Regions:
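Extended, charge-rich alpha-helical interface modules
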Residues: 1-78
Length: 78
């Protein structure tokens, strides 16, 4: 079961990895693919955190929040 703290910790780990990749400058194809995967995962975890906070705000159980598929969270940006 994820808590807000574990979600935030995972977001920080992903963001740190993202920054390390950007600092390298020119990326290999594998690193570019990893960067894209990190960005999708970050979107998913930020969405999960928003869901948890919204459920809590409206008196629902935040533990019922679930990670949504990339197809769903990526559509928010479009």
């Amino acid at each position: 079961m994820a808590t807000d703290q574990t979600v935030l910790r995972h977001i920080k780990e992903l963001a740190d990895e993202e920054h390390r990749l950007y600092e390298r400058g020119k990326l290999t194809d594998e690193e570019k693919a990893r960067l894209k995967a990190i960005n999708v995962a970050l979107d998913q975890y930020w969405d999960l955190l928003r869901q948890r906070r919204a459920k809590r705000e409206f008196g629902q159980n935040p533990d019922e929040a679930e990670i949504r598929s990339p197809g769903i969270v990526e559509k928010y940006e479009n």
